[in-house]
């Protein structure tokens, strides 16, 4: 069966088309576009017309790929930004029009933070060594961060309403961020993590797995890549000291300096400092609570979990 997943988050819209056989996936096409659907949502509570238009353009291109590859089933999920807005009906109507032209009846669905966490976990653990379990899987998005503990199943999860876009819009207004802005952002992250780690007992974890664009970009920079190489990133490992060094470097840079880095995806340079601050705080907590001082980065994530869910 050829199945597809579309994940529309606060910062990016992503597509996976895969062949599914006996519960295993073979990638046919995987793509990410930065559309910033959630731009300004934290302040206004509404999707901006320009953000809807950018998302429509990307989704139209994705629909063409679904048709070209003969996709039989597709599931599109919308996450943090869509949970928070009052005009989501405009978004739903757009997705129904674009996707429905290829797969009749297809439309985006808003999933809860709990389901987002479970799908991310399911997608991430497929190729991990079970001897390294339990895993704490962290999906750091634009508007929310999912923290999940488990081995062959989810033991505990929490969706925190903080991510690289939301943190940047709330706290990091200067270029580069001032020390005062950085400290304010750290306080916000610590407040959210205090709650999350009261629910998810990360001290039981043996391995930390990071998902999504902030994590993958940090790994690329830690490994001194001049261009982004997804095959090399998948299941790459970053020692804690290297991770913190890259985070500090990014936080101190201007947006233009970050944008000039070879592995930096277009549209991520203005928000990755917020993601780096969150990763630093996570790294410190996991080292203190669980003795974990290494990050494993996976390219397989919620998209893989969504495809598995739609393929049955």
Which residue ranges define each predicted feature?
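N-terminal glycine-rich anion-binding loops that anchor highly charged ligand groups
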Residues: 24-39, 66-69
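Ser/Thr-glycine-rich phosphate-binding loops at phosphate-binding pockets of nucleotides
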Residues: 10-12, 79, 124, 141-147, ...
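N-terminal basic/disordered segments at the start of proteins
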Residues: 1-26
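Hydrophobic residues embedded in beta-strands of well-ordered beta-sheets
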Residues: 13, 25, 145, 154-155
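Conserved beta-strand/loop subsegment of P-loop NTPase cores
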Residues: 73-76
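Helical "lid/coupling" subdomains associated with nucleotide-phosphate turnover
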Residues: 3, 17-20, 40-64, 68, ...
């Amino acid at each position: 069966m050829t199945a597809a997943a579309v994940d529309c988050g606060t910062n990016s819209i992503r597509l996976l088309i895969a062949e599914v056989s006996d519960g295993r996936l073979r990638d046919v096409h995987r793509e990410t576009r930065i559309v910033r659907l959630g731009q300004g949502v934290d302040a206004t509570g509404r999707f901006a017309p320009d953000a809807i238009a950018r998302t429509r353009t990307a989704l139209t291109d994705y629909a063409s790929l679904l048709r070209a590859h003969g996709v039989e089933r597709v599931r599109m999920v919308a996450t943090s930004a869509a949970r928070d807005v009052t005009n989501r009906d405009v978004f739903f109507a757009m997705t129904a029009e674009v996707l429905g032209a290829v797969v009749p009846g297809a439309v985006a669905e808003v999933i809860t933070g709990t389901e987002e966490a479970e799908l991310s976990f399911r997608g991430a653990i497929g190729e991990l060594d079970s001897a390294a379990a339990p895993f704490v899987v962290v999906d750091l998005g634009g508007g929310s961060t999912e923290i999940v503990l488990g081995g062959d199943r989810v033991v505990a999860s929490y969706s925190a309403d903080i991510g690289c876009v939301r943190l940047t819009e709330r706290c990091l207004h200067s270029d580069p961020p001032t020390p005062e802005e950085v400290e304010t952002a750290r306080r916000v992250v610590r407040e959210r993590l205090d709650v999350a780690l009261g629910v998810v007992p990360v001290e039981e974890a043996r391995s930390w797995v990071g998902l999504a664009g902030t994590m993958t970009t940090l790994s690329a920079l830690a490994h001194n890549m001049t261009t982004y190489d997804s095959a090399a990133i998948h299941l790459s490992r970053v020692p804690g000291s290297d991770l913190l060094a890259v985070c500090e470097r990014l936080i101190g840079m201007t947006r233009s300096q970050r944008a000039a880095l070879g592995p930096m995806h277009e549209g991520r340079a203005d928000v990755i400092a917020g993601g780096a601050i969150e990763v630093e705080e996570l790294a410190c907590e996991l080292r203190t609570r669980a003795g974990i001082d290494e990050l494993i980065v996976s390219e397989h994530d919620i998209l893989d979990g969504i495809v598995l869910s739609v393929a049955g």
